[in-house]
Curated annotation (Swiss-Prot):
Catalyses which reaction(s): oxaloacetate + 2 Na(+)(in) + H(+) = pyruvate + 2 Na(+)(out) + CO2
The species this protein was found in: Salmonella typhi
Keyword Translocase set for record: yes
Any Pfam family matching the protein: HMGL-like
Name this protein carries in UniProt: Oxaloacetate decarboxylase alpha chain
Cofactor(s), by name: biotin
Record's keyword annotation contains Transport: yes
Domain Pyruvate carboxyltransferase stretches: 3-263
GO cellular component term of the entry, any: cytoplasm
GO MF annotation list: decarboxylation-driven active transmembrane transporter activity; oxaloacetate decarboxylase activity; pyruvate carboxylase activity
Function field: Catalyzes the decarboxylation of oxaloacetate coupled to Na(+) translocation.
Lineage top rank: taxon: Bacteria
Length: 591
């Protein structure tokens, strides 16, 4: 049986290797060659790409999809969809899910890999049904993980539930690289023995087991696998396409792909990748810590990047040790977007504040309340009681509690566009969906769609190193430099060589934050993380009780409620919505 290959170079490869920064301008020159290979599909959209396009790159993700479809008409295009979460970080009403899928199909999407971070089939049903109703390929997903709560029967039961919902195929998604070769053989064999279904396997290379797992899965009867072109493979990413093609050549599983065509593509990305070196993670080879922490490849690079932003890069090992403990408290949930971000952010909070759950992120509270769906086992009872504050947890499908919201969202976006003088796209619904998924950054993107200066500068290849170093080397490290009101993150190597500049939080638009509370003025309320103020809730002179929410901080793509550690009166509010803050900045004081 010929094995179908899905190459993930245009989506998960760069999401895992360099924080989802690959730009459309670096995809289109090679698109025709990719289209000519004969892949089963090309993953090129979804996951974190939508967020990265509007947050960092200043690209319209809908335009990206249309351009890729135009450039690669022969090959099915594939995306990763987070079920009821779509591409955002909360559940959306069914009417939003339906319209998003419709627009994705109309813009060029063919194959939808639909997963739910909780492995709750109720959260995948609406998306899967929408995909099939619009004539696209619906692939249900088992987000693979291990824990005392997960057995072979867990995966067989979920497979059966997905088949009852209605799918065209099923993917086993090993986002952390923890699927052992023997477990892969057993899982694929047992699913194939019990069910008539096309089966696909996705593995990450982070722990060094992925190639072996793919081969054993192929022996067991898997129909297709994910790989990445060699120059965009390994470490945090995926097994190399060429290696598997060569391994299977001349066997009953021969992929039929031309190794010479693949090498030309690899050569192209070998050069392109050099431009994105500033976003690369530190991993060389494999990382056995993942066998314990179960951190997906993309999450690991993001954790490293985010800890640097918090000036806490040296705390990575502590965070990795804390992640399994947080995961257990949250019912042994799998670590895949958005739960990977939720668990990772909570672990960072626990480490940086020096006290476990001193601050509970809004999304962590959501899992404890049941707002994301069923957890594999019950969550930590004490933490749940703390966030429920006497109310009952959610036990129904979370989206059943949501009223239709598309009409209201559309009216709101059109109103804001009129007020701000924003010209919406020809298909305005695409812009509406962009803002629906990412309210603040989506609107900011629409305001600056034609203003590249509002986003990260174009990446550039690292300059050649000089033959001789300066006699007095500069101190190496990562610094934030302000140039004409804009802040940039700069890496300075030993000897003073400056590599890629990347945009930091805009400096000019942010109000200066009070550095410290004057002596005797009260107890300072400080920022536990670097980020942006989402909303200031407390008002000057307001009396608050211990535990009251004072403001909401957006950091690491999550919302963190900053609560009063004691009763008092709010004085000296030093921030407003949209302001950038650093760790330890005083936000207000409690007198």
């Amino acid at each position: 049986m010929t094995i179908a290959i899905t190459d993930v170079v245009l989506r998960d490869a760069h999401q895992s290797l360099f924080a989802t920064r690959l730009r459309l301008d670096d995809m289109l020159p090679i698109a025709a060659q990719l289209d000519d290979v004969g892949y089963g599909s090309l993953e090129c959209w979804g996951g974190a790409t939508f967020d990265a396009c509007i947050r960092f790159l200043g690209e319209d993700p809908w335009l990206r999809l249309r351009e890729l479809k135009k450039a690669m008409p022969k090959t099915p295009l594939q995306m990763l969809l987070r079920g009821q979460n779509l591409l955002g970080y909360r559940h959306y009403a069914d009417d939003v899910v339906e319209r998003f899928v419709e627009r994705a199909v109309k813009n060029g999407m063919d194959v939808f890999r639909v997963f739910d971070a909780m492995n709750d089939p109720r959260n995948m049903k609406a998306a899967l049904q929408a995909v099939r109703s619009h004539g696209a390929h619906a692939q249900g997903t088992l987000s693979y993980t291990t824990s005392p709560a997960h057995t072979l029967q867990t995966w067989l039961d979920l497979t059966e539930q997905l088949l009852e919902t209605g799918v065209d195929s099923i993917a086993i998604k090993d986002m952390s690289g923890i699927l052992t070769p023997m477990a892969a053989f057993e899982l694929v064999s047992e699913i194939k023995k019990r069910f008539e279904v096309r089966l696909h396997l996705h593995c990450h290379a982070t722990t060094g087991m992925a190639e072996m797992a793919l081969l054993k899965a192929i022996e067991a009867g898997v129909d297709g696998v994910d790989t990445a072109i060699s120059s965009m493979s390994a470490t945090y990413g995926h097994p190399a396409t060429e290696a598997l093609v060569a391994t299977l050549a001349g066997t009953e599983h021969d992929t039929g792909l031309d190794i010479l065509k693949l090498e030309n593509i690899a050569a192209y990305f070998r050069e392109v990748r050099k431009k994105y070196h500033a976003f690369e993670g530190q991993l060389k080879g494999y990382d056995s810590r993942i066998l314990v922490a179960q951190v997906p490849g993309g999450m690991l690079t993001n954790l490293e990047s985010q800890l640097k932003q918090q000036n806490a890069a040296d705390r990575l090992d502590q965070v990795l040790a804390e992640i399994p403990r947080v995961r257990e408290d949250l019912g042994f949930i799998p670590l895949v977007t958005p739960t990977s971000q939720i668990v990772g952010t909570q672990a960072v909070l626990n480490v940086l504040t020096g006290e476990r759950y001193k601050t509970i992120a809004k999304e962590t509270a959501g899992i404890l309340k049941g707002e994301y769906g069923h957890t594999p086992v019950p969550v930590n009872a004490a933490l749940q009681a703390r966030v429920l504050e006497g109310s009952a947890p959610v036990t129904c499908r979370p989206a059943d509690l949501l009223k239709p919201e598309l009409a209201e969202l559309e009216a709101d976006v059109r109103r804001q566009a009129q007020e701000k003088g924003i010209t919406l796209a020809g298909n305005a619904i695409d812009d509406v969906l962009t803002v629906a998924l990412f309210p603040q950054i989506g609107l900011k993107f629409l305001e600056n769609r034609h203003n590249p200066a509002a986003f990260e500068p174009l990446p550039q290849a690292e300059a050649a190193q000089p033959v001789a170093k300066a006699e007095k080397p500069a101190a190496s490290g990562i610094y934030t430099v302000e140039v004409e009101g804009k802040a940039f993150v700069v890496r300075v190597s030993d000897g003073g060589d400056i590599s890629q500049l990347t945009t930091a939080v805009p400096a000019a638009s942010s109000a200066p934050v009070q550095a410290a509370a004057p002596a005797g003025a009260g107890t300072p309320v400080t920022a536990p993380l670097a980020g942006n103020i989402w909303k200031v809730i407390a008002t000057e002179g307001q009396s608050v009780a211990e535990g009251d929410v004072l403001l909401i901080l957006e950091a690491m793509k999550m919302e963190t409620e900053i609560r009063a550690a004691q009763a008092g009166t709010v004085r000296g509010i030093a921030v407003k919505s949209g302001d950038a803050v650093s760790v330890g900045d005083t936000l207000m004081t409690l007198a």
